[in-house]
UniProtKB/Swiss-Prot annotation:
Protein name according to UniProt: Glutamate--tRNA ligase
Encoding gene, per UniProt annotation: gltX
Presence of keyword Signal: no
The protein's role, per its UniProt record: Catalyzes the attachment of glutamate to tRNA(Glu) in a two-step reaction: glutamate is first activated by ATP to form Glu-AMP and then transferred to the acceptor end of tRNA(Glu).
Organism classification: Bacteria, Bacillati, Actinomycetota, Actinomycetes, Kineosporiales
Key words of the record: Aminoacyl-tRNA synthetase, ATP-binding, Cytoplasm, Ligase, Nucleotide-binding, Protein biosynthesis
Pfam families found in the cross-reference section: Anticodon_2, tRNA-synt_1c
Motif residue range(s): 'KMSKS' region: 266-270
UniProt GO MF annotations: ATP binding; glutamate-tRNA ligase activity; tRNA binding; zinc ion binding
Domain of life (superkingdom): Bacteria
Similarity-based family: Belongs to the class-I aminoacyl-tRNA synthetase family. Glutamate--tRNA ligase type 1 subfamily.
Binding locations of ATP: K269
Top EC class, one word: ligase
Motif interval(s): 'HIGH' region: 21-31
Gene3D superfamilies per UniProt: 1.10.10.350, Glutamate-tRNA synthetase, class I, anticodon-binding domain 1, HUPs
């Protein structure tokens, strides 16, 4: 027998919330939004954030997915006070290791009359509905609630093994105050007695999730809207757990809004935007993504979208979460991320560019001091222009390649105007005679040679130089880039393009 200590009742102790994902697939932004809101509620109230894993589905669970969940939480800085890797008074925190606990609770529920054996097959249930003229969608009909010993013996003689169902009170309406949605009511008969244990003895999610919440003293169950319909069954089980002394009270429930994609459809795992790591790979920083995920159902004020995670924690109240579906707007997410990039200290921003430049092959695994010095000079040129760190290779790659290897992008060369050759000739003449090579020196000399000397409008004057130096139509500021490249590289690139015209 497992010794189970009753936890404190909700409202009589500090807040205890949990994040309990199943390790199936890559982390979904909706899942991580749920983790964020639970974490923020715990941090705001001075409560406890518990992290456990619901890994009882051997056919779908994977260690790879488990590792990805840990990676996601670690990257975002969503730390937990109790659970996986941290420990605590309710170990273990993986459901697959808690079978003795569930078996003991099942035994106690059976002894108290809250569970009963159910032998009915799906086909038999459907046949009874059809014979009675009832809709088949009603599901289980309660046939096994009061079987006689003779009926049970007959079923067992046929070799049948029963499932175990929770005996719901007859004629009972279930209502509760959802901390997000307000008063919600489920009428009696709108849901059947749920199966809690399979015929082979394996406990189902419908049992283990509420049991863990009860034993771990969870005071607030904050979860996705898709689980709202299961709440009355869970409340009924929690009441049974109170009756047998496993729990002291039913936790409070709050159901967070769906995260939708284009067309207001629920964001599917098949949608790229649903994959948390897709956004990290594109160059979202944790501050920007956390800020945007917070906006999927909550806001710090009506006139302010950009805030730090510390400001979120200080202001977060789960009662302020909006129940309406929240659309994942990629453009808005990128704008939020851009704002956070601009808020980074220069050295922090520079450091975050390095992995993206390395992944693209722009920088080696061990950049040289010269490369790091060049990056330090160039990073401020793009910090105000960048929305995603993944743009770094395209914006800065030209600074880290040999002069002859600069890729002249087709759209850039195609946009060159007829006077491009004259512009390059005049620029080369002016620059070759230049003694200084500062941004100010370069701008003064080139404006005098091209804008004043050739009469080319400033709008078009420097496009050939930009293409020659960077290979692109759009780049970091030209004169600053040429200063960083230095005299020899800049002149070599101008001559290279001129030779093609």
């Amino acid at each position: 027998m497992t010794d189970i200590a009753a936890p404190p009742a909700p409202g009589t102790s500090p807040v205890r919330v949990r994040f309990c994902p199943s390790p199936t697939g890559t982390p979904h932004v909706g899942l991580i939004r749920t983790a964020l809101f639970n974490w923020a509620h715990a941090r705001h109230t001075g409560g406890t954030f518990v992290f456990r894993i619901e890994d009882t589905d051997a056919a779908r669970d994977s260690e790879e997915s488990y590792a990805q969940i840990l990676d996601a939480l670690d990257w975002l800085g969503l730390d937990w006070d109790e659970g996986i890797g941290v420990g605590g008074p309710h170990e273990p925190y993986r459901q697959s290791l808690r079978r003795p606990v569930y078996d003991d609770v099942v035994r106690r529920l059976r002894e108290a009359g809250h569970l009963y054996e159910s032998f009915s097959t799906a086909e038999e249930i459907e046949a009874r509905h059809e014979a009675a003229g009832r809709p088949k969608v009603l599901g289980y009909d309660g046939f096994d609630r009061d079987l006689t010993p003779e009926q049970v013996a007959a079923f067992r003689a046929e070799g049948r093994e029963p499932t175990l169902r929770l005996r719901l009170p007859e004629g009972r309406d279930y209502s509760f105050d959802d901390v997000v949605r307000g008063r919600i009511e489920f009428k009696a008969g709108s849901f059947p007695d749920p199966v809690l244990v399979r015929a082979n003895g394996d406990p189902l999610y419908t049992l283990v999730n509420p049991v863990d919440d009860a034993l771990m003293g969870i005071t607030h169950v904050l979860r996705g809207e898709d689980l709202l319909s299961s709440t009355p069954r869970q409340i009924a089980l929690h009441e049974a757990l109170v009756d047998i002394g496993v729990s002291q009270a039913v936790p409070l429930f709050g159901h967070l809004p769906y995260v939708t994609g284009e067309g207001s459809k629920k964001l599917s795992k098949r949608d790229p935007e649903s994959n948390l790591f897709h956004h990290r790979d594109r160059g979202f920083i944790r501050e920007g993504l956390l800020n945007y995920l917070a906006l999927l159902g909550w806001g710090i004020s009506e006139d302010r979208d950009v805030f730090s995670v510390e400001e979120m924690v200080a202001a977060f109240d789960v009662a302020d979460v909006n129940a309406s579906p929240a659309r994942f707007d990629v453009a808005k997410a990128e704008a939020i991320n851009a704002a956070h990039l601009r808020l980074l200290a220069p050295e922090d921003f520079r450091g975050r560019l390095v992995p993206y430049l390395q992944a693209a092959g722009v920088l080696p695994a061990q950049p040289s001091p010269e490369q790091l010095e060049r990056l330090a000079a160039a990073a401020p040129l793009v910090q105000e222009r960048m929305t995603l760190l993944g743009q770094a290779p395209g914006m800065l790659g030209f600074l880290f390649v040999a002069d002859g290897d600069v890729v002249l992008e087709p759209d850039a060369t195609a946009a060159l105007r007829p006077e491009a050759a004259d512009v390059l000739d005049a620029s080369l003449a002016a620059l070759e005679a230049l003694t200084g090579w500062t941004t100010a020196d370069l701008e003064a000399a080139l404006r005098a040679a091209v804008v004043e000397g050739l009469g080319v409008k400033p709008k078009f004057a420097f496009a050939p130089l930009r293409t020659a130096v960077t290979g692109r139509r759009v780049s970091p500021p030209l004169f600053e880039s040429m200063e960083i490249l230095g005299r020899e590289s800049s002149l070599a690139r101008l001559r290279r393009l001129r030779a093609t015209l």
